[in-house]
Amino acid sequence: MDQLAGAPRILVLGGAHMDHRGTIHGPTVPAASNPGHFAHEPGGGGFNAARNLAALGHAVRMISPRGGDADGETVAAAALAAGVVDHPFVYLDRRTPGYTAILSETGDLVIALADMDLYRLFTPRRLLARTVRADLDWASHILCDANLPEGTIEALAHRARDMGKPLAGIAISPAKVLRFRRAVSGLDFLFMNGAEAAAFSGREATNAADWPAILRDCGLKGGAITQGGRDIIAFDETHSLALTPPPVGTVVDVTGAGDAFAAATLSALAGGTPLPQAIRQGAALASLTVSSSHAVIAETMKDVLVTLVGLVDQPRNLA
């Protein structure tokens, strides 16, 4: 059952798979065996965002391709535990996608491998399925990630625009963010990092404050660019902003930080909060996430988040 019927209803389409994260013990030595340990948990940009949105009190539904294997069952159990209504396309003879990341001893990403072939089967035709059409009708807001094929993202953007429903996107990677290029007419907001913004626009910003103008020239109505510990840049049709993220004592694991920022910012925007305050909530949740060994906060962290938002600086208007 969907919770909190009066809250915004958010449909998420995209990645829901297993994350395998290895952390190196000591300095990273390329082209050599490094001592370390592995941790395994459900992940995926869309799924991380969906679970954070549910923890923040929203009614959330998730659509994603999945294999008929133990990993698929683990993802389904995680959705149930998080309060996300799970509507997967299950391919019994296929393997659930997976993401393997190697992190330095300071929690920074060294390299990652994405085994995501199954997502290619989420074709535009899938959007015509009765269950998907019902979920689109149900939703007040839609979020997708770039694990979906380019044609599917474009078709979803057209559908969202025709239905008058806000659509936000998560870039996932510099290679995959290109899948949003043909969807800009129906895309209201795109969450990305600096490398993804450069790939999407085909340009480099000599000054981070140039990103709003560069991305508007690409047709984007709104977006946010995170840059690790440096200023977050965000814009919409009326704002161009820079926000200094709150300091983090110890970075444990950066996995999921961008998804957390997207979820908390979208949560605020969907509730009617203006962009300057929405990105403060996003920055607060991202800082909590990098301080944790998990990609998604527990529901019990909501009170901590409220307190932390109050400690985040006000954003600055860009000239």
Each model region followed by its residue ranges:
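Conserved post-catalytic alpha-helical subdomain immediately downstream of the catalytic base
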Residues: 55, 220-229, 246-318
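Structural motif
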Residues: 9, 140-141, 189
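Conserved phosphate-binding/catalytic loop of the ribokinase/pfkB sugar-kinase fold
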Residues: 65, 91, 101-141, 146
